[in-house]
Amino acid sequence: MRRTLYRLMIELTNGRFTSYILRKFAQSRLSSIIIPSYAKVFQINQDEMEKGLKEYRTLHELFTRKLKEGKRSIDTDASSIVSPVDGVFADHGPIEDTKTFDIKGKRYSIVDMLGNEERATRYAGGTYMVIYLSPSHYHRIHSPLSGSVTERFVLGRKSYPVNAAGMEYGKEPLSKNYRSVTEVSSDGEHMALVKVGAMFVNSIELLHERDTVQKGEEMAYFTFGSTVVLLFEKDMIEVVQELKSGQELRLGEKIATRLAHK
């Protein structure tokens, strides 16, 4: 019953018009009025911001802010996979041979997440990792490894929340929400970086257009908090043992080891 009511409420409020109004407000000068309150409520670390709080003219500018030079360091070891974002480590685990994985009691299909069977097949038996970005986090997304970009594509239309309630009651938000996917080939092995849109504000802006990418290079940004899913081929990585669900991660921090480089 709770799940049904939750989904009904989301469907009634999560339309194009609502999203349009919220997006327009966030991009308007009027939104600057609530910036101080927003920064206080979400405890934004102002010491790391590229500009002072009063220099951001709109909420959108604050959402998509850059960091001061040198505030994040990228693990440069050739064997390391790094966190592509600042966020909360949600979960990791195996991708079954059926091209599915379980998180928070919900089964997700890689076929649904990536849009077709051919793309999903290469990740069967591999590993998934999920990182959640709250409204307080730095919203820019960077590459977790170096390699060649093999494909970029967008799927989905609406988005359910990706917070705890959304994960429990939503319609498989990680594989059904609006999402932008970048696949990267590195030394013959593939990784998919799935950028999942948040409710109301689906916008994911791609910044990287070249055929190659370097570890730590900026690739895109969210216009609000959301989630990143990383998919790796079978026998490609070993997740850092110390990582725990709920742990805060910082961009550039090592989260896994490339088995081919051990």
Swiss-Prot record:
Topology versus the membrane: Peripheral membrane protein
Residue ranges of coiled coil: none
Entry-annotated residues carrying Pyruvic acid (Ser): S226
EC numbers: 4.1.1.65
Keywords from the named record: Cell membrane, Decarboxylase, Lipid biosynthesis, Lipid metabolism, Lyase, Membrane, Phospholipid biosynthesis, Phospholipid metabolism, Pyruvate, Zymogen
Modification after translation, per record: Is synthesized initially as an inactive proenzyme. Formation of the active enzyme involves a self-maturation process in which the active site pyruvoyl group is generated from an internal serine residue via an autocatalytic post-translational modification. Two non-identical subunits are generated from the proenzyme in this reaction, and the pyruvate is formed at the N-terminus of the alpha chain, which is derived from the carboxyl end of the proenzyme.
Classification via InterPro entries: PS_Dcarbxylase, PSD-B, PSD_type1_pro
Example of a GO cellular component annotation carried by this entry: plasma membrane
Pathway membership: Phospholipid metabolism; phosphatidylethanolamine biosynthesis; phosphatidylethanolamine from CDP-diacylglycerol: step 2/2
GO biological process, one term: phosphatidylethanolamine biosynthetic process
Record's subcellular location: Cell membrane
GTP-binding in keyword set: no
Pfam families: PS_Dcarbxylase
Catalytic activity: a 1,2-diacyl-sn-glycero-3-phospho-L-serine + H(+) = a 1,2-diacyl-sn-glycero-3-phosphoethanolamine + CO2
Site note Cleavage (non-hydrolytic), residues: G225, S226
Superkingdom of source: Bacteria
Active site feature: D86 (charge relay system), H142 (charge relay system), S226 (charge relay system), S226 (schiff-base intermediate with substrate)
The UniProt record lists the keyword Cell membrane: yes
NCBIfam families: PRK03140.1, PS_decarb
Cited function: Catalyzes the formation of phosphatidylethanolamine (PtdEtn) from phosphatidylserine (PtdSer).
Family designation: Belongs to the phosphatidylserine decarboxylase family. PSD-B subfamily. Prokaryotic type I sub-subfamily.
Family annotation (PANTHER family): PHOSPHATIDYLSERINE DECARBOXYLASE, PHOSPHATIDYLSERINE DECARBOXYLASE PROENZYME, MITOCHONDRIAL
Protein name (Swiss-Prot/TrEMBL): Phosphatidylserine decarboxylase proenzyme
